[in-house]
Amino acid sequence: MNKKFVFGVFGALMMPMVMGSCSSSDEPQKGGEDDNESKGKFVFATTVQGSNATSYVLLTGESLDEGTLSPVNNGLLNDGATQWVFHKNYLYALTYNQGNAGTTRSYILGDDGEMKARGTEYRISRFSSYGAYDNDILTMATGESNDVVDGNGYHAMMLNVTYLDVVNETSTTNHATAEHPYLMENFLGNGEYVTLSGAEQSGSHLYCGAIPMGLSQYGAAYDNGKWIREGYEHLVHSEAGGSGAGSYKAGELVGTQYPDECWVAIYDNDDFLNPTLVKTDRISTPSGRFRSQYYQTIWAADNGDIYVFSPSYAKTMTDPLQKTKLNAGVCRIPAGSKQFDDYYCDIESQADGKSFMRCWPAGGNYFLMVMYDRPLSESGFAGTDLAIFDATSKKLTYVSGLPSDITSLGKTVFTRNGNVYIPVNVENGYPTIYKINPATAQASKGVVVEGASDITGFGFLEPVK
């Protein structure tokens, strides 16, 4: 079976705008699978940096393993995206603009082998994570509730979910009610609010990392500061400050008071109601992090077991009380279970004290890891190395055969015929897809996109009738 994975971050409020363009009829073919005898093609989202402007081009190709492509006088021009999401033979461009609505739309592969924009366009505000469930792409974010406000005027934090039905090209959102307010306050029983990182479907269940964010104004003020731990009072901000993703309000306690815990929310479906919460104290928070982005690190292996990875990003916190003492590692929830078993592996100790930025399934019980180039305790760490983690043997092996001048690694991976593929951007050359054999951790050079400066996403699509 061949899979496409797209991961990352964000939360969305979407308002569809019908644009007079191509038809949105249509049932998907074998979504997400690459049938060698199909009319499908590989699709590459590329960035082209000109002397005066930047352009974005969707290219199609026949192979990941060899050859060259060029965006010059070729492909479909588009507005670019923060994250390209391939799901069931549809390609969605999720665009995130801080503080303003971003525009996204979806694309299909036509019978003529050319990419086509579909007719509906969406406005997306802030989103912090996303995933997929059945026919829907899910975007999630935690934000202020308009309905639950305390006597100080502080708003409780709630979950906002948008459902993008890729087949019917519709967008719906969850609606808070008195019965179901979708509150994220005191989500774990310690007073802190959480955000969700990733959404991994296994069977009918949905697995999300529950990421404790600290105490909101609402949580910190609750019952005269009931949830502020003794000795942690200095962490409550006395005035507003910061900027961007690091901004905060007076009265907030930013960052968890419980950094040595890992929580997973397991939902029976995608309504995001009544989750089963499972905890382990062997690893820290189950999410990668880069600025305001939260990277999914909970993934299902081919046999349905759920592997929960933690990069221990809380080691970067400034206050010692908020630093985790736990190494980057992985635990497991067996297929069909709602509890962690005794599986555990310390990944950091196998990497000379280094952690990882993000990870994806690579087929079987293998996982591809984007490794940091130095420990999180040092400044300037960057995710420019790759490694394969074998969950069966609990062995981490760095990938060989990669170029030495890597500047960045792709946001998307693709598995096919026992190999995993990832875009690699280099300082002296064009972006290239590399093929990695998980069993040997050996990489080999694949298709090159000449004239581009970046491959921001790639996957496989079959024509939609």
What label would you give each PLM region?
Residues 1-44:
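Bacterial Sec-dependent N-terminal signal peptides
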Residues 59-61, 105-108, 154-169, 222-273, ...:
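Beta-propeller blade signature
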Residues 66-78, 113-125, 166-187, 274-285, ...:
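Beta-propeller fold detector
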Residues 76-87, 121-135, 184-198, 286-298, ...:
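Repeated scaffold domains used in trafficking and secretory/extracellular systems
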Residues 257-340, 353:
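Beta-propeller domains
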